[in-house]
């Protein structure tokens, strides 16, 4: 290489050093000073990994003094280049010697890097292009946000997430029965809202006992890093902001924190996009006296655009409280309780019509009349004829039924604000088998009851009933000895024998009180050394998590977990299938919640429910009412709350007084009313609600698409190649899993999310679901997203030179492959990416400037190419510069044409989708007040904003590859 003092060169291996200057040429060695970093490098003159920097006419370059010149011509004098051109500020003619060039010039544009000899390996060009295609594919997918979470592909959960998560500021009550996965539904919606940019700031309000569980669940299943806020965290946050809630984007807190006036005011002022309230059945309301908890959530719901309320028991605090929760979501719609009741009464006709449409039978006249009346603003006669015709194929008839059913769901009832799936509509649950074990009443309890009766304590009936259900509490009150009762209680003897005979089984034990749970643990430990752990409301979150983990542990873990009523709320242990009810709660909803700890989707075995009880006591009578009256042990009982309210007085009387005639009468009345309510529920609103909530065939089609996405081998191959290029160590661990570790040769100094110890990953959903310690990799996972960002955000793969060995073409034939990115910058919340995401535009030019991209696809072209040594590649580029410059200009013309068409297509797609959605919602608003005006306004504004951003779309050359034909 000819070197001369003052020449400017760049290091091929250390481009970060900037422009180097030749300061010494001696014998076979050359020394360069890199003024930007102050470092010297000595190279062999014959093999120096250096590229001479010579700019071309049309380039604008910066001088060392800070001014710029637009080059018009070059002059070479004494082996140094002098640039002549126009001063960028004064517009005067100036000259600039190459020694006076800025030391900090970076070759960021692909064409500059190519001409400066900064040429990447062939495979990196391909990986960069694949990364851009992957990002484009993900951005345009309507499944964005649903593919990545570590959850099972359960139809009703994914359907609700798809329906609700795609809305602007969704305001919804998720009220699936216990065990159907409301937390997962909420997590899917949160994940989707975040990934699509519909929400950025999210507040989750949960009972104090569930804060840590939500934190772990959001991270483990959804890769979302929430922060738990309590009073201490709020005080700490003052160092960063006067309002502690502004210090994090994703926050979990308890209702108790917000009971403090100052904290509530700060939360109200914190500009949330979405609020999630778990266990919303605790929000009690009456027109005269709404609870403090209700008023807290109401204050937030008035300023937060999106609200999700989660409850398994909508009517637990009465129908008024259920109405009040709907009122939180839409106060304009649910303004009057009496009007709400009157509307509910009309649901029967709607449900009958929906039932008729959902069955593959001929529509009866009554159903046709109902449909005609209910959809009076729409001409449904053609659809009815299609359904009733014998000459039409089944697929067309089914489509007509689905269309009418959707019209019905859209126009009537609470379908857009309330989702409730029942076990009757969701398959895959195990059986519940009830086992009762009677025992004689111990003499000590009999004596305690007699003494209590003689003392004539004036207790309210409900308090007397509660006392009768827990004789050990009464005994303790007299004996003042909290531990001794377990030494003679036959239920404890039975419990010990049961655990001894089921040593290999995990057993969940639930009792009403924390004191009872602690006493039982002491009994098991001291009498038989049985490994058990407790779980109650007085324990810290960390202590409860440790207890839960100890119970879940296969080897050396606890055989039994003993929970109190409140302590077990919201916790799930479906890896166990034996449930022991040490006592019974005086509320059928609480009984269902107990059983729901095991009876959940994901339970692999039939559930064995065991109840040891004391014969001829209130315990036996309550057991009979639950079992014979409600069948509440073996089936879920949606009407349990209503029945309890109706028969509470009679039930409490029976519990307090042993009167078999009264008991028989109560059972007869309960059974009769149970059947009535069951029939009414089957005929009424619930059927329509379930059709809307589980999604039917549309939900199944959604699951099919998600499953196909899981099995996309092309995606898996692309991700593995991405990690190869970055330099991540990959060790096959078997069982569908790989261990990823950072290596010494990684392309980037750090890879966020990949720590030094490594991480075990899988592309298989089932493996991820069975192993919490293995990360589930999809294109939505942060490790993949970060990898894509590392490549596309750097200069990796922006230049390449390759040889095409093809004797059908003349040797020396040149092709120029250009990858442009079409991009319209806009806030994520506009949803512009749905119509015009960053889009790769490929241009493949021959030496005459003809674009052959449509005729020669990327994959087949890429397979025929061979790599070229970087120094040879640099020489080939320099020799081809006279051809390349006009080709670059021609390529940009083709790319601009493609961009224009992209914008036209994107605008048409946006107009079609959003106008269609707007017209649909406007039509529905006329007949269904559930459609909120702000939803319509959001769509109108979205159309205006997106159009403006599309008009400002930009083109940027992202990568360039020069290809030469060779016969060698």
Swiss-Prot record:
Residues 163-332 form the Helicase ATP-binding domain. ATP binds at residues 176-183. A motif (DEAH box) lies at residues 278-281. Gene3D superfamilies: 2.30.30.140, 2.30.30.930, 3.30.360.80, 6.10.140.1500, 6.10.140.2230, P-loop containing nucleotide triphosphate hydrolases, Tandem AAA-ATPase domain. Keywords: Activator, ATP-binding, DNA-binding, Helicase, Hydrolase, Nucleotide-binding, Transcription, Transcription regulation. It holds the Pfam family SNF2-rel_dom. Interacts with the RNAP. Has a higher affinity for the core RNAP than for the holoenzyme. Its ATPase activity is stimulated by binding to RNAP. NCBIfam families: PRK04914.1. This is RNA polymerase-associated protein RapA. It comes from Shewanella frigidimarina (strain NCIMB 400). The lineage of its organism: Bacteria, Pseudomonadati, Pseudomonadota, Gammaproteobacteria, Alteromonadales.
